[in-house]
């Protein structure tokens, strides 16, 4: 999956006038941590093509040149490079991975197995920190966190998925609608994440990418009359989403961002991706009365989705800035993001340690697990202390 795959025709379900098929593989999304990166690729056979007006040979649906999604990918990569420059592991931490990269070397893999910066750097660069959003009036973090990534692995998986899904959607629906779908879905994922995961720094574009999947699914429902192999397409999409959400219950994964992004994208798909029904396209140039452009069910879905979407954003933002903890109103919801087992814990409390400096010796105790350690360090920086604390508390 990459640039080569993105050159194939934009396709989804079979249309009712002519058919063309092509096979593509969708890589399961990383989603916010290395746990989901281990997911296997799922293959998806798509078969969508623009159909022509009868007797005229004129394409009803315009094909767009996809430029916005590649720009999003370039922006994400650029932000990651800047983040690694700011991180400057050799100077701030000392214990780095891939030292030959110099200033761009990664944090120790015990601290960040995704090959990326420290959590402190991610926070500085605009990661989603609920305390800073609510008490520090830094609401912009609800948007900025979608452009940051925890590491090379995280970035690679999200960008491959974005290219594969996003380019095809932009070809069919244009940069305005797909750009709005991507950005608003990421924002919706951030809001839900902030309501339920209140003690972690959250970053990643997975919520926005899940929004594209949600839009794909709702687009089939809203444009039901123009496709012939709807059931197969819907089942395939649902399985892809279910697998990725299932991977999201592993520890360290922000599944609430995925759920929020998918739900937002699903509702937005009804609003942004609506198309004229088959009968209108087939009969509009023929004799007799002209049918309505959209069917009644399309108008109903459009209206209901828009109302739910607006109401959801209003309630979510009001709750967030009134410091409402979603877990207090839903005792079981935390299982949607992590299910504890004998193999792992779902403790999401941030690493916190007590330290004592005597000469060149730094003594540290993790308040989460009670582990203690001593280090020979003279005047360690705050970043170095934070890095050691994170490793000790793992």
Curated annotation (Swiss-Prot):
What Pfam families does the annotation carry?
Answer: Rhomboid
**What does the record say about its membrane topology?**
Multi-pass membrane protein
| Highest taxon, organism lineage | Eukaryota
Record has Hydrolase as a keyword: yes
Q: Where is the active site?
A: 206, 258
| UniProt key word Protease | yes
Q: Which GO terms describe its biological process?
A: proteolysis
User: Where, subcellularly, is it found?
Assistant: Membrane
What's its top-level EC category? hydrolase
Concerning Gene3D superfamilies, the annotation shows: Rhomboid-like (1.20.1540.10)
Q: Which GO cellular component terms, listed alphabetically, does the Swiss-Prot or TrEMBL entry include? A: membrane; plasmodesma
Q: Write the record's keywords in alphabetical order, separated by commas.
A: Hydrolase, Membrane, Protease, Serine protease, Transmembrane, Transmembrane helix
Q: What EC number(s) does this enzyme carry?
A: 3.4.21.105
UniProt lists the family membership as follows: Belongs to the peptidase S54 family.
| Protein's name in the database | RHOMBOID-like protein 4
Species whose genome carries this gene: Arabidopsis thaliana
- In the UniProt record, the gene name given for this protein reads RBL4
């Amino acid at each position: 999956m990459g640039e080569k795959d993105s050159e194939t025709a934009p396709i989804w379900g079979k249309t009712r006038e002519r058919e063309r098929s092509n096979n593509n593989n969708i890589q399961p999304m990383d989603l916010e941590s290395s746990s989901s990166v281990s997911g296997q690729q799922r293959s998806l056979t798509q078969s969508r093509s623009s159909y022509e007006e009868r007797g005229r040979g004129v394409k009803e649906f315009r094909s767009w040149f996809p430029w916005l999604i590649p720009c999003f990918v370039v922006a994400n990569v650029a932000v990651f490079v800047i983040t690694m420059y700011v991180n400057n592991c050799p100077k701030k931490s000392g214990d780095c991975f891939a030292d030959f990269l110099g200033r761009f070397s990664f944090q120790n893999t015990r601290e960040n197995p995704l090959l990326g910066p420290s959590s402190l750097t991610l926070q500085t660069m605009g990661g989603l920190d609920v305390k800073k959003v609510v008490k520090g009036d830094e609401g912009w973090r609800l948007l900025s966190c979608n452009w940051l990534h925890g590491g090379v692995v995280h970035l690679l998986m999200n960008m491959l998925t974005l290219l594969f899904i996003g380019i095809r959607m932009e070809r069919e629906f244009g940069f305005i609608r797909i750009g709005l779908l991507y950005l608003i879905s990421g924002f919706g994922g951030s809001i839900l994440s902030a309501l339920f995961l209140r003690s972690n720094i959250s970053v990643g574009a997975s919520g926005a990418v899940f929004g594209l999947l949600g839009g794909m699914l709702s687009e089939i429902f809203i444009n039901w009359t123009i496709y012939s192999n709807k059931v197969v397409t819907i089942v395939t999409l649902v399985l892809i989403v279910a697998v990725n959400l299932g991977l999201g219950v592993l520890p360290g994964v922000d599944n609430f961002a995925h759920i929020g992004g998918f739900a937002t994208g699903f509702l937005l798909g009804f609003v942004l991706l609506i198309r004229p029904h088959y009968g209108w396209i087939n009969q509009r140039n023929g004799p007799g009365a002209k049918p309505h452009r959209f069917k009644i069910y399309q108008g109903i879905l459009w209206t209901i989705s828009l109302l739910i979407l607006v109401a959801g954003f209003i309630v979510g933002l009001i709750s967030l800035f009134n410091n409402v903890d979603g877990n207090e109103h839903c005792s079981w919801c935390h299982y949607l993001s992590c299910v504890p087992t004998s193999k792992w814990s779902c403790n999401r409390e941030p690493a916190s340690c007590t330290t004592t400096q005597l000469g060149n010796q730094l003594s540290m105790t993790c308040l989460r697990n009670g582990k203690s350690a001593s280090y020979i360090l003279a005047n360690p920086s705050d970043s170095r202390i934070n890095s050691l604390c994170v490793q000790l508390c793992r």
